[in-house]
Amino acid sequence: YTQEDYDHPNQTVTFLDNHDVTRFGYTQRSQKVYNAALAVLLTSRGIPTIYYGTEQYVIPSDASDVAGRVYMPTECGFSTTTTAYQLIATLSTLRRSNDAIAYGTTTVRYSDDNVMVFERQFYDDVVVVAVNRQPDSASVIPAIQTNLPTGQYSDYLDGSLFGTATTVQNNLIPSFTISGGGVCVWQYQASEAPSTPQIGDVISTTGRPGNTVHIYGDGFSGNISVYFGTTAATVQSTTANK
């Protein structure tokens, strides 16, 4: 809905909370909704920022930003087994491996008062995320269009947020029921490296002659030439994705 509001949406820094605002755990006490919000943050466009303690469901004593700056060893402890911690780890891995999340376009495939299904796509890489923000009521989602290829897709989160598998045929996800607070993540990655470079992001977007520019994407192995307009740039180094 806000694509036209940003020149470079994939470079925006996104967050649920930080040191200048109220802790998300203070305003949202339902862990189902909390986890669903984390899933959306980590699969949406932009650069997600995770405030320390978010993975521990920190709830401060009041709504001030100061109260949110807890001293972890004595005020909340640290566990690597919380659902939030595991969710952040799992979806961070997906962000690194599937370029649809880092660079892809966003298409809202379905939305109502409680549920949103959105699709991220970068060339042949596709990720579909279905989220029910209502923690207590399941919703039935009608069949929806998708760019996922025909095939069976397990929930990338292995059901940790009550997600289920799906089977795609002819670019259609069949009707499904999503549990209260549920999140489904289905993903597809192209099996072969691209034959031509696929540019995902360019940083920085402004500069002057002599500045170093970083180009991210896929298919950059081998001899690569870079031009800005008709001016050839000196390529200092390349990897498959940078």
PLM region spans:
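Aromatic- and carboxylate-lined catalytic core of secreted/periplasmic carbohydrate-active enzymes
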Residues: 3, 68-113
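Short proline/glycine-enriched turn/loop motifs at strand-loop junctions of beta-rich domains
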Residues: 136, 146-151, 218-224
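Conserved, mostly hydrophobic/aromatic
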Residues: 19, 41, 53-55, 91, ...
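Alpha-amylase-like alpha-glycosidases and glucanotransferases acting on alpha-linked glucans and related
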Residues: 1-47, 56, 63, 101-103, ...
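Beta-strand/beta-sandwich contexts
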Residues: 192-225, 231
